[in-house]
């Protein structure tokens, strides 16, 4: 706790946020409770072709049946404005709902199924829907170090709100690698990397990288800093290939 008090003023200087929420980063590694919920409040900044300053709220609820079943539901909403020199600020919105179930098959192997619906004004996605399934396996599980790998397939529907409205339907392979490290009683670090290529178009792929540092205040609250990066090799219309987001906010556990 002394370490946290020393570093707290530095953390509060970085009140900037990373709006792309990634469901794997919000997964609770402590599965003792059968029912648990958490809420995140973040303030942030993201940069691609434009700069956006925003505020983000995320709610998550998990249900655990130890050594058998894990399900969770996430709701996320983000409101911000796009700032350009000598131009009127533009209001931007982003949000999604995500549901996932993981069924344990063996001690270190589970089967997952998931679905999601959302929208993203920042990259002109009017509506995005997807569903899929896959496997999740533990690579290493120790008290202060945990690593997981997941892989599967998903069907993705995207409707774009560009000058000319268009729709894209793709089947994608999705995989991710998760690393979670406890660096002390009040400090932890996690990294999640996704790779999502289209099955029919090998050059249409996305790479998502999420990094988070979490400072524990007490059993019911944390301060989080995240630095995330997204690369889309074949973005639609005039969207940039890459953008990054920086996030600093508070997490309440109940």
Which residues fall in each region the model found?
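Repeated loop/turn-to-beta-strand initiation elements of outer-membrane beta-barrel proteins
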Residues: 67-73, 108-111, 143-147, 183-189, ...
């Amino acid at each position: 706790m002394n370490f946290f008090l020393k570093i707290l003023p530095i953390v509060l200087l970085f009140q900037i946020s990373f709006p792309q929420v990634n469901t794997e980063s919000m997964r609770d590694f402590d599965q003792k409770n059968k029912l648990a919920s958490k809420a995140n409040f973040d303030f942030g900044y993201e940069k691609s072709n434009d700069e956006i300053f925003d505020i983000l709220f995320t709610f998550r609820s998990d249900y655990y049946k130890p050594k058998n079943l894990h399900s969770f539901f996430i709701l996320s909403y983000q409101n911000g404005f796009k700032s350009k020199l000598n131009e009127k600020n533009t209001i931007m919105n982003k949000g999604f709902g995500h549901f996932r179930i993981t069924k344990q098959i063996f001690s270190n192997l589970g089967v997952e199924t998931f679905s999601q619906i959302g929208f993203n004004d920042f990259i002109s996605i009017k509506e995005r829907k997807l569903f899929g399934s896959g496997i999740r396996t533990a690579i290493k599980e120790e008290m202060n170090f945990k690593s997981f790998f997941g892989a599967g397939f998903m069907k993705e529907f995207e409707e774009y709100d560009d000058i000319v409205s268009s729709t894209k339907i793709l089947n994608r392979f999705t995989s991710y690698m998760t690393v979670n490290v406890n660096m002390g009683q009040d400090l932890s670090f996690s990294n999640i990397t996704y790779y999502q290529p289209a099955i029919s178009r090998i050059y249409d792929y996305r790479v998502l990288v999420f990094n988070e540092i979490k400072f524990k205040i007490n059993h019911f609250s944390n301060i989080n800093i995240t630095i995330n990066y997204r690369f889309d090799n074949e973005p639609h219309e005039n969207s940039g290939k890459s953008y990054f987001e920086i996030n600093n906010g508070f997490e309440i556990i109940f």
